[in-house]
């Protein structure tokens, strides 16, 4: 008998995967192995097709293998994969980011969201000459030691938000607060505000599924950070250029001191960036003394993928169309569940959607998220997968909608969900 792709992988890769959430541990079973992707679809190694709502966890806002992105990457690769020297494409991508986000004057490219948030924290500590940072429970900002505390995403999925191997000396410098809890936030600033270097926040908490901010949460956070001289880092790795033309900062009219980017700015290639005012960013080496570097940072193939992905989002009506697609799917899921007597909460913001099996009327924070029935989600996940719809294999991950999800695909998805809800209790 031939080994499965997963069995083969597990011999040489820990857990058979290169990012833990892919392993299906929280939903059970073996992960599907993908051979190719196009538009709204994935195709596994056995040739089966799936409507995909993972979208590589966010970058594929224009769908998989968009012909313009593929063509641009092919052209760039013929000129060399990486130079270890400056190139004009990294300048062009930085210019696009600066043009779209008012709080950004300068950009430093790196290779992942983790690198971006890690570097932003270092820069904030240097700028303030303070050590402590504040993050929010259930928010995930990559797997660096300082930020792997009360973390969401894969850490939350595996029930180990504080990883072994992270020294207590690191953890004690990281404070946590409940997301969307203004009273708790104000108490923390009264007690610790003068010692905080930075607050880092997901403007939409997309790593404990999808939890948008309450109306006064981000404005209060901005006011408190200004009052106490704390650097506000808005982590837009997930939301940047997905939820609006200027990202979540544009959507919610909020301005960061430092912003982190990833996912959409790479178009499927490994790209991250951190950005901010010229004064702050000029503290970075080689101009200043705050060190940050990367062998493949700004490589031309990744840069052209990001440039092309962003250019496609500049089409007239792009974000209105994406928001309408997201709303259609969200309402379809609500009605499909309601028709079958199943209570769910569905949160949605342009291109992002969260489905929670909970009896609560709304989901606003990590504590609310934890009421969700993960076993029921696992059953729903496998039933949807069996019918040809691929969701992230965790109750704590966002559903991503792309421009490739046309009305026919969305209608098919809603019909499948209605069928699955009807048989979920069997």
Curated annotation (Swiss-Prot):
CDD domains in UniProt: OAT_like (cd00610)
Reaction(s) the record says it catalyses: (S)-4-amino-5-oxopentanoate = 5-aminolevulinate
Xref: InterPro entries: 4pyrrol_synth_GluAld_NH2Trfase, Aminotrans_3, Aminotrans_3_PPA_site, PyrdxlP-dep_Trfase, PyrdxlP-dep_Trfase_major, PyrdxlP-dep_Trfase_small
Modified residues (N6-(pyridoxal phosphate)lysine): 263
EC numbers, comma separated: 5.4.3.8
GO-annotated biological processes: protoporphyrinogen IX biosynthetic process
Cofactor: pyridoxal 5'-phosphate
Pathway: Porphyrin-containing compound metabolism; protoporphyrin-IX biosynthesis; 5-aminolevulinate from L-glutamyl-tRNA(Glu): step 2/2
Subcellular location as annotated: Cytoplasm
UniProt keyword terms in alphabetical order: Cytoplasm, Isomerase, Porphyrin biosynthesis, Pyridoxal phosphate
Pfam families reported in the protein's UniProt record: Aminotran_3
Cellular component terms per the entry's GO annotation: cytoplasm
Catalytic class of the enzyme: isomerase
GO molecular function, one term: glutamate-1-semialdehyde 2,1-aminomutase activity
Entry-linked HAMAP family: HemL_aminotrans_3
NCBIfam families found in the cross-reference section: hemL, PRK00062.1
Family: Belongs to the class-III pyridoxal-phosphate-dependent aminotransferase family. HemL subfamily.
Record note on quaternary structure: Homodimer.
Protein name, UniProt field: Glutamate-1-semialdehyde 2,1-aminomutase
Taxonomic placement: Bacteria, Pseudomonadati, Pseudomonadota, Gammaproteobacteria, Cardiobacteriales
Name of encoding gene: hemL
């Amino acid at each position: 008998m031939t080994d499965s792709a997963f069995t083969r992988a597990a011999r040489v890769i820990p857990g058979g995967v290169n990012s833990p959430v892919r392993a299906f541990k929280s939903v059970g079973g073996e992960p599907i192995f993908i051979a190719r992707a196009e538009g709204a679809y994935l195709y596994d190694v056995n040739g089966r097709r799936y409507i995909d709502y993972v979208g590589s966890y966010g970058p594929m806002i224009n769908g998989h293998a968009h012909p313009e992105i593929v063509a641009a990457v092919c052209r760039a690769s013929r000129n060399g994969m990486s130079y270890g020297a400056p190139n004009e494409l990294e300048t062009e991508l930085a210019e696009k980011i600066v043009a779209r986000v008012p709080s950004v004057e300068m950009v430093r490219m790196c290779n992942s969201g983790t690198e971006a948030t890690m570097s932003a924290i270092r820069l904030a500590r240097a700028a303030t000459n303070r050590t402590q940072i504040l993050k929010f429970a259930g928010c995930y900002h990559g797997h660096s030691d300082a930020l792997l505390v009360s973390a969401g995403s894969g850490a939350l999925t595996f029930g180990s938000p504080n990883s072994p191997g992270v020294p207590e000396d690191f953890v004690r410098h990281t404070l946590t607060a409940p997301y969307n809890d203004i009273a708790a936030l104000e108490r923390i600033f009264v007690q610790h505000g003068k010692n905080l270097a930075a607050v880092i926040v997901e403007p939409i908490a997309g790593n404990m599924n999808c939890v948008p901010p309450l109306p006064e949460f981000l404005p209060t956070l901005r006011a408190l950070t200004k009052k106490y001289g704390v650097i506000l880092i808005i982590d837009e790795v997930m939301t940047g250029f997905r939820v609006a033309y200027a990202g979540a900062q544009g959507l919610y009219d909020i301005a960061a001191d430092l912003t982190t980017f990833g996912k959409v700015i790479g178009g499927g290639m490994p790209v991250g960036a951190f950005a901010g005012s010229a004064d702050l960013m000029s503290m970075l080496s080689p101009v200043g003394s705050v060190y940050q570097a990367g062998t493949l940072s700004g490589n031309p193939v990744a840069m052209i993928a990001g440039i092309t992905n962003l250019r496609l989002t500049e089409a007239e009506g792009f974000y209105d169309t994406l928001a309408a697609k997201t709303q259609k799917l969200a309402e379809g899921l609500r009605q499909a569940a309601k028709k079958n007597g199943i209570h769910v909460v569905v949160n949605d913001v342009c291109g992002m959607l969260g489905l929670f099996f909970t009896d609560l009327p709304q989901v606003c924070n990590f504590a609310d998220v934890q009421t969700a029935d993960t076993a029921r989600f696992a059953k729903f996940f496998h039933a949807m997968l069996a019918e040809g719809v691929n969701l992230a294999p965790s109750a704590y991950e966002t559903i991503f909608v792309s421009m490739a999800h046309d009305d026919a695909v969305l209608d098919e998805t809603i019909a499948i969900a209605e069928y699955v809800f009807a048989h979920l209790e069997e």
